[in-house]
Protein backbone atom coordinates (compact mmCIF):
# COMPACT_ATOMS: atom_id res chain seq x y z
CA UNK A 1 0.00 0.00 0.00
CA UNK A 2 1.11 3.56 -0.64
CA UNK A 3 0.10 6.58 1.41
CA UNK A 4 -0.15 10.19 0.26
CA UNK A 5 2.20 11.91 2.73
CA UNK A 6 3.45 15.43 3.40
CA UNK A 7 6.87 15.54 1.71
CA UNK A 8 7.94 19.19 1.97
CA UNK A 9 6.77 22.33 3.73
CA UNK A 10 7.98 25.93 3.79
CA UNK A 11 6.19 27.49 6.76
CA UNK A 12 5.12 31.16 7.04
CA UNK A 13 6.96 32.60 4.05
CA UNK A 14 6.05 36.17 3.07
CA UNK A 15 4.92 36.83 -0.50
CA UNK A 16 7.50 39.17 -2.08
CA UNK A 17 6.09 39.49 -5.62
CA UNK A 18 2.77 39.04 -7.43
CA UNK A 19 3.33 38.94 -11.21
CA UNK A 20 -0.07 38.60 -12.90
CA UNK A 21 1.26 38.57 -16.47
CA UNK A 22 4.17 36.18 -15.86
CA UNK A 23 3.67 32.57 -16.94
CA UNK A 24 1.91 30.81 -14.06
CA UNK A 25 3.90 29.32 -11.21
CA UNK A 26 5.50 30.22 -7.90
CA UNK A 27 9.14 31.33 -7.94
CA UNK A 28 10.87 30.26 -4.73
CA UNK A 29 14.38 31.22 -3.58
CA UNK A 30 16.65 28.30 -4.56
CA UNK A 31 17.96 28.05 -0.99
CA UNK A 32 14.40 27.41 0.22
CA UNK A 33 13.69 24.93 -2.59
CA UNK A 34 16.75 22.87 -1.68
CA UNK A 35 16.12 23.01 2.07
CA UNK A 36 12.55 21.75 1.58
CA UNK A 37 13.51 19.08 -0.99
CA UNK A 38 11.46 20.74 -3.75
CA UNK A 39 12.45 20.79 -7.42
CA UNK A 40 11.56 22.94 -10.39
CA UNK A 41 8.17 22.10 -11.95
CA UNK A 42 7.05 20.11 -8.89
CA UNK A 43 3.39 20.54 -7.96
CA UNK A 44 2.93 22.58 -4.80
CA UNK A 45 -0.03 23.60 -2.69
CA UNK A 46 -0.08 27.11 -1.27
CA UNK A 47 -2.16 28.05 1.75
CA UNK A 48 -2.55 31.77 2.44
CA UNK A 49 -2.57 32.35 6.20
CA UNK A 50 -3.93 35.90 5.81
CA UNK A 51 -7.06 35.17 3.76
CA UNK A 52 -7.55 31.39 3.89
CA UNK A 53 -7.07 30.86 0.13
CA UNK A 54 -5.77 27.42 -0.88
CA UNK A 55 -4.54 26.67 -4.39
CA UNK A 56 -2.11 24.55 -6.38
CA UNK A 57 0.57 25.55 -8.87
CA UNK A 58 4.15 24.47 -9.62
CA UNK A 59 7.52 25.61 -8.33
CA UNK A 60 10.15 27.44 -10.35
CA UNK A 61 13.56 28.68 -9.22
CA UNK A 62 13.82 32.14 -7.72
CA UNK A 63 17.09 33.97 -7.25
CA UNK A 64 19.26 32.19 -4.66
CA UNK A 65 19.53 34.06 -1.37
CA UNK A 66 16.86 36.59 -2.34
CA UNK A 67 14.03 35.34 -0.12
CA UNK A 68 11.80 35.44 -3.21
CA UNK A 69 8.29 34.03 -3.04
CA UNK A 70 6.65 35.21 -6.27
CA UNK A 71 3.11 34.21 -7.14
CA UNK A 72 2.75 34.32 -10.92
CA UNK A 73 -0.11 34.21 -13.39
CA UNK A 74 -3.53 33.55 -11.89
CA UNK A 75 -1.92 32.67 -8.53
CA UNK A 76 -1.04 36.38 -8.23
CA UNK A 77 -4.75 37.03 -7.57
CA UNK A 78 -4.70 34.78 -4.49
CA UNK A 79 -2.40 36.89 -2.29
CA UNK A 80 -1.07 40.35 -1.64
CA UNK A 81 2.51 41.42 -1.02
CA UNK A 82 3.48 40.53 2.52
CA UNK A 83 0.83 37.83 3.00
CA UNK A 84 2.16 34.82 4.90
CA UNK A 85 1.85 31.48 3.12
CA UNK A 86 2.57 27.83 3.70
CA UNK A 87 3.99 26.01 0.69
CA UNK A 88 3.60 22.22 0.73
CA UNK A 89 4.17 19.22 -1.50
CA UNK A 90 3.04 15.64 -1.06
CA UNK A 91 4.39 12.28 -2.21
CA UNK A 92 3.22 8.70 -2.46
CA UNK A 93 5.25 6.71 0.07
CA UNK A 94 5.08 2.94 0.43
CA UNK A 95 4.82 1.13 3.75
CA UNK A 96 8.41 -0.15 3.57
CA UNK A 97 9.75 3.41 3.28
CA UNK A 98 7.56 4.53 6.18
CA UNK A 99 8.74 1.61 8.32
CA UNK A 100 12.36 2.47 7.43
CA UNK A 101 11.87 5.93 8.96
CA UNK A 102 10.87 8.13 6.03
CA UNK A 103 10.35 11.76 7.17
CA UNK A 104 9.24 15.00 5.50
CA UNK A 105 11.40 18.14 5.20
CA UNK A 106 9.83 21.05 7.10
CA UNK A 107 11.47 24.46 6.76
CA UNK A 108 10.64 27.40 9.02
CA UNK A 109 11.18 30.95 7.79
CA UNK A 110 11.90 34.27 9.52
CA UNK A 111 10.51 37.70 8.60
CA UNK A 112 13.03 38.08 5.75
CA UNK A 113 12.24 34.66 4.24
CA UNK A 114 15.52 33.26 5.53
CA UNK A 115 15.70 29.80 7.07
CA UNK A 116 15.44 29.87 10.85
CA UNK A 117 14.97 26.15 11.44
CA UNK A 118 14.20 22.64 10.17
CA UNK A 119 12.12 19.74 11.47
CA UNK A 120 11.13 16.33 10.22
CA UNK A 121 7.73 16.14 11.93
CA UNK A 122 4.76 18.25 12.97
CA UNK A 123 4.55 18.37 16.78
CA UNK A 124 1.58 16.84 18.55
CA UNK A 125 -1.08 19.50 19.07
CA UNK A 126 -2.08 19.98 22.71
CA UNK A 127 -4.65 22.07 24.55
CA UNK A 128 -3.43 25.41 25.83
Curated annotation (Swiss-Prot):
<keyword id="KW-0566">Pantothenate biosynthesis</keyword>
<feature type="active site" description="Proton donor">
    <location>
        <position position="58"/>
    </location>
</feature>
<keyword id="KW-0670">Pyruvate</keyword>
<dbReference type="GO" id="GO:0004068">
    <property type="term" value="F:aspartate 1-decarboxylase activity"/>
</dbReference>
<protein>
    <recommendedName>
        <fullName>Aspartate 1-decarboxylase</fullName>
        <ecNumber>4.1.1.11</ecNumber>
    </recommendedName>
</protein>
<dbReference type="Pfam" id="PF02261">
    <property type="entry name" value="Asp_decarbox"/>
</dbReference>
<comment type="pathway">
    <text>Cofactor biosynthesis; (R)-pantothenate biosynthesis; beta-alanine from L-aspartate: step 1/1.</text>
</comment>
<keyword id="KW-0865">Zymogen</keyword>
<comment type="subunit">
    <text>Heterooctamer of four alpha and four beta subunits.</text>
</comment>
<dbReference type="GO" id="GO:0005829">
    <property type="term" value="C:cytosol"/>
</dbReference>
<comment type="function">
    <text>Catalyzes the pyruvoyl-dependent decarboxylation of aspartate to produce beta-alanine.</text>
</comment>
<feature type="binding site">
    <location>
        <position position="57"/>
    </location>
    <ligand>
        <name>substrate</name>
    </ligand>
</feature>
<comment type="similarity">
    <text>Belongs to the PanD family.</text>
</comment>
<keyword id="KW-0068">Autocatalytic cleavage</keyword>
<feature type="binding site">
    <location>
        <begin position="73"/>
        <end position="75"/>
    </location>
    <ligand>
        <name>substrate</name>
    </ligand>
</feature>
<dbReference type="GO" id="GO:0006523">
    <property type="term" value="P:alanine biosynthetic process"/>
</dbReference>
<feature type="modified residue" description="Pyruvic acid (Ser)">
    <location>
        <position position="25"/>
    </location>
</feature>
<dbReference type="InterPro" id="IPR009010">
    <property type="entry name" value="Asp_de-COase-like_dom_sf"/>
</dbReference>
<keyword id="KW-0704">Schiff base</keyword>
<dbReference type="GO" id="GO:0015940">
    <property type="term" value="P:pantothenate biosynthetic process"/>
</dbReference>
<keyword id="KW-0456">Lyase</keyword>
<keyword id="KW-0210">Decarboxylase</keyword>
<dbReference type="InterPro" id="IPR003190">
    <property type="entry name" value="Asp_decarbox"/>
</dbReference>
<feature type="active site" description="Schiff-base intermediate with substrate; via pyruvic acid">
    <location>
        <position position="25"/>
    </location>
</feature>
<keyword id="KW-0963">Cytoplasm</keyword>
Amino acid sequence: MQRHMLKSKIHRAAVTHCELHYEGSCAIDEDLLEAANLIENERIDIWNINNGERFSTYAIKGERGSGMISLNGSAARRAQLGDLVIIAAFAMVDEAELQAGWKPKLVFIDEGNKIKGHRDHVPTQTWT
